[in-house]
């Protein structure tokens, strides 16, 4: 199913094309695209178009798509995709606070909380429940003595009515904040925005805004610019002063006829209250004519220079869809499931034969160029916040992990033997698949796969699902799970011949993997125990939060060298919902880790003593521990308790480590303590 988005690239390279560009000047800064040779274009390829062709395409799809009925969302609800990641920013010195965890070093990600050597910035709800509109700056105290933060100053962000602040970027060198706000036209379901992915018109009235704020060390916060964009925010990235955002929208103008211009169907931009203009020029758009699930959704690639006094931007767009993206420091890859799938509650059910399209654009400041598209078997998984982790780039080669099972719920799967006498398992039974893609003549060609005829060993056991995955250089790490946690190490040094180097089986699973150095991984997930029922013994119940230290220095023999279990069944950690929900600081061979958790370990009257017993809520806290990299051991420190005593949703909780202090954020409320 195509899930079109806008990809907004907000760039801060002042030297590009001599300064400010208006929307009408967009095409002047575009790089040359690379398309397949005639006859080599595949059904997933994008192609150049013109204003007439684009208008015809959009009007044709508008006629059919607008007939779709919007169904009650509670039955088909998914949250807006989260742009996810999980790398680490090592501390430069003890006076540097912990930073947002990142998937790619040097590719920053937005979050509710940002910090530098002097201040912690947060985007907070107003006390009168008007929404998350307040930018607060707290002064960090000295290394010893009272660790409590002091409020330095505040600024009510100038978002439009109905737009809520969602995240921040901090440019410490320029003393600049970029605050992002969003407005959803979807329904509200609890704390998650609910959108029906299969009713494109639900995306028609979305809005995204960027507010720029000067943040001098001595002086007050001051808003300097407001950029209003048509479209729903899906995710963002930043390289230096260049901010990259992904949005999705649907034409608001449904009038079809000769008097309607194609720009009437395209998203708009307004800067500092100026009149609305087209965000992207038709000549900068591409179409996916081979898409059988065509819709009028548009993905726009926009670059805005944030380092200049005057607004400047460039833009691209393509029709089709994207449900996830991954970005390196040079390229962005946009992926979407090709076949239609249904929803079961808030998780998808994929078609039996599913594949995923991937589109590549190169990035160079305000310049963006289409480099080709590819298609891989399988899908990127069931959880939106893990999909970007399924992709990774190394030396220009893209690695993609997909899975083959059609639904989230555990099932009993019997492998299909190819040859009973040799007990060789059918490659199709592998829960995970690795595809290796390289750019070739305007396409992304598959040059290597796992499993394959030469290396048929499956990635995971029958019935398992992919959980954590992480690409680091010429190594890949992934976790599958049903009861035990098989960690696989992949050798990606030869693109045409990837291989499994080793595996490790331990109880439970990891949702995220964080590299601590070249030989140690930190895994965070859940423990699990067997259900005790007859069968293959691989069905189990998850328990408390599990933290594992995994030695991968010998790739063929990975070892779990230490572990921690937090709470009982029902315990949750923010990092399991959002990879930014963990603070990791690495300094002089010592690692400090702080993660907000909601601990459940209170027995209840309906428990029966079995592994499925769900414990009652006990307390909220920031759980703290250290990792000795040379000894490969955990040391638990005293937790920092929350000032909020009742059970609550912890998805927005954060922690910041600063010297011998730890600061615990809970939706605008700070609790501070010593390490």
Q: Where are the predicted features?
A:
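Bacterial N-terminal signal peptides
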Residues: 4-14
């Amino acid at each position: 199913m195509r899930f079109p988005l806008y990809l907004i690239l907000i760039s801060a390279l002042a030297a590009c094309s001599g300064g400010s560009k208006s929307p009408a000047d967009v095409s002047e800064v575009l790089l040359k695209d690379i398309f397949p040779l005639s006859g080599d274009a595949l059904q997933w390829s994008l192609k150049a178009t013109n204003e007439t062709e684009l208008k015809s395409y959009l009007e044709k799809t508008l006629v059919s798509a607008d007939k779709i009925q919007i169904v009650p969302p509670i039955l088909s609800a998914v949250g807006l995709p989260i742009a996810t990641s999980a790398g680490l920013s090592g501390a430069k010195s003890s006076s540097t606070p912990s930073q947002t965890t990142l998937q790619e070093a040097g590719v920053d990600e937005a979050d509710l909380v940002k910090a530098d050597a002097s201040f912690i910035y947060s985007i907070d709800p107003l006390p009168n429940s008007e929404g998350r509109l307040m930018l607060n700056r707290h002064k960090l105290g000295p290394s010893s003595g009272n660790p409590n933060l002091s409020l330095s100053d505040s600024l009510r962000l100038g978002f439009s009515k109905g737009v809520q602040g969602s995240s921040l970027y901090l440019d410490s060198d320029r003393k600049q904040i970029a605050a992002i706000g969003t407005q959803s036209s979807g329904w509200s379901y609890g704390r998650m925005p609910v959108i029906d992915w299969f009713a494109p018109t639900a995306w028609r009235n979305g809005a995204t805004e960027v507010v720029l704020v000067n943040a001098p060390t001595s002086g007050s916060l001051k808003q300097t610019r407001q950029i209003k964009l048509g479209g729903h925010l899906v995710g963002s990235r930043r390289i230096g002063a260049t901010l990259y955002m992904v949005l999705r929208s649907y034409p608001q103008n449904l009038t079809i006829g000769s008097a309607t211009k194609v720009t009437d169907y395209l998203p708009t931009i307004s800067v500092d209250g100026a009149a609305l203009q087209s965000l992207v020029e038709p000549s900068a758009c591409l179409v996916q004519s081979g898409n059988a699930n065509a819709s009028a959704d548009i993905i726009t690639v926009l670059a805005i220079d944030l380092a200049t006094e005057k607004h400047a931007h460039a833009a691209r767009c393509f029709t089709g869809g994207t449900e996830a993206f991954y970005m390196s420091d040079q390229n962005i890859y946009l992926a979407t499931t090709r076949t239609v799938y249904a929803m079961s509650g808030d998780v998808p059910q994929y078609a039996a034969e599913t594949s995923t399209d991937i589109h590549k654009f190169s990035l160079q400041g305000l310049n963006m160029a289409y480099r080709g598209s590819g298609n891989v078997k399988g899908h990127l998984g069931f959880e939106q916040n893990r999909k970007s982790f399924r992709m990774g780039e190394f030396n220009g080669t893209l690695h993609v992990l997909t899975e083959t099972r059609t639904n989230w719920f555990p099932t009993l799967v019997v492998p299909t033997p190819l040859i009973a006498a040799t007990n060789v398992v059918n490659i199709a039974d592998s829960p995970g698949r690795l595809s290796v893609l390289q750019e070739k003549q305007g396409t992304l060609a598959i040059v290597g796969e796992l499993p394959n005829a030469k290396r048929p060993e499956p990635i995971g056991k029958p019935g398992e699902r992919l959980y954590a995955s992480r690409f680091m250089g010429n190594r890949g790490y992934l976790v599958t799970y049903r009861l035990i946690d098989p960690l696989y190490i992949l050798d990606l040094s030869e693109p045409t011949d990837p291989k499994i180097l080793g595996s490790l089986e331990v109880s439970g699973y990891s949702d995220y993997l964080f590299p601590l150095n070249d030989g140690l991984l930190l895994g965070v997930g859940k423990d699990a125990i067997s259900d005790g029922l007859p069968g293959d013994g691989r069905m189990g119940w998850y328990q408390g939060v599990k933290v594992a230290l995994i030695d991968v220095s010998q790739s063929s023999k990975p070892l779990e060298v230490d572990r921690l279990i937090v709470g009982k069944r029902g315990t949750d950690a923010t990092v399991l919902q959002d990879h930014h929900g963990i603070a990791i600081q690495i300094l002089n061979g010592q690692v400090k880790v702080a993660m907000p958790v909601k601990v459940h370990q209170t027995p209840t009257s309906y428990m029966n003593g079995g592994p499925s017993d769900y414990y009652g809520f006990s307390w909220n806290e920031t759980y703290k521990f250290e990792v000795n990299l040379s000894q490969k051991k955990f040391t638990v420190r005293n937790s920092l308790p929350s000032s909020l005593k009742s059970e609550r949703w912890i998805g927005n909780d954060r922690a910041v480590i600063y010297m011998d202090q730890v600061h615990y954020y809970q939706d605008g409320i700070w609790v501070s303590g010593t390490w």
